[in-house]
């Protein structure tokens, strides 16, 4: 059980690291070029999906830090209610990060390819550093989402090991 707890702590630390690194890459990235004697600046604020992804990453990183803090102070969960809550929040966080990353990737693909119908130019020909940093941020976010899926499975194991395998939704101690 101790190894499982250590694994959960390491996973949460890695998730926080990847999410904060992604937030820094997205939030601090901007590039200015002179195009036809006009200074053009591009940043994450021009892409709504990247802005939403930044906020999602910060909130989920804060949630994982709170979970680490609860584990640090040995807040032992004797009943199943806090474990259910933790399990559902871990699941929700994993799904939200994956969905936000997928939306940001789709929006970024529009920036890479352009769209004649929407009069979007291909930004990556002009703003290459911006595009490479956004691409690396999206890859790091997918890694964080995969780690969160693994963390959710550990959370599910911690929850369902309390229940009896013979009686439906009965604690092992009461059967």
UniProtKB/Swiss-Prot annotation:
<keyword id="KW-0472">Membrane</keyword>
<feature type="topological domain" description="Cytoplasmic">
    <location>
        <begin position="1"/>
        <end position="7"/>
    </location>
</feature>
<protein>
    <recommendedName>
        <fullName>CASP-like protein 2C1</fullName>
    </recommendedName>
</protein>
<feature type="topological domain" description="Extracellular">
    <location>
        <begin position="29"/>
        <end position="45"/>
    </location>
</feature>
<comment type="subunit">
    <text>Homodimer and heterodimers.</text>
</comment>
<feature type="transmembrane region" description="Helical">
    <location>
        <begin position="8"/>
        <end position="28"/>
    </location>
</feature>
<feature type="topological domain" description="Extracellular">
    <location>
        <begin position="113"/>
        <end position="136"/>
    </location>
</feature>
<dbReference type="GO" id="GO:0005886">
    <property type="term" value="C:plasma membrane"/>
</dbReference>
<comment type="similarity">
    <text>Belongs to the Casparian strip membrane proteins (CASP) family.</text>
</comment>
<keyword id="KW-1003">Cell membrane</keyword>
<keyword id="KW-1133">Transmembrane helix</keyword>
<feature type="topological domain" description="Cytoplasmic">
    <location>
        <begin position="158"/>
        <end position="175"/>
    </location>
</feature>
<feature type="topological domain" description="Cytoplasmic">
    <location>
        <begin position="67"/>
        <end position="91"/>
    </location>
</feature>
<keyword id="KW-0812">Transmembrane</keyword>
<dbReference type="Pfam" id="PF04535">
    <property type="entry name" value="CASP_dom"/>
</dbReference>
<feature type="transmembrane region" description="Helical">
    <location>
        <begin position="137"/>
        <end position="157"/>
    </location>
</feature>
<feature type="transmembrane region" description="Helical">
    <location>
        <begin position="46"/>
        <end position="66"/>
    </location>
</feature>
<feature type="glycosylation site" description="N-linked (GlcNAc...) asparagine">
    <location>
        <position position="41"/>
    </location>
</feature>
<feature type="transmembrane region" description="Helical">
    <location>
        <begin position="92"/>
        <end position="112"/>
    </location>
</feature>
<dbReference type="InterPro" id="IPR006702">
    <property type="entry name" value="CASP_dom"/>
</dbReference>
<keyword id="KW-0325">Glycoprotein</keyword>
<dbReference type="InterPro" id="IPR006459">
    <property type="entry name" value="CASP/CASPL"/>
</dbReference>
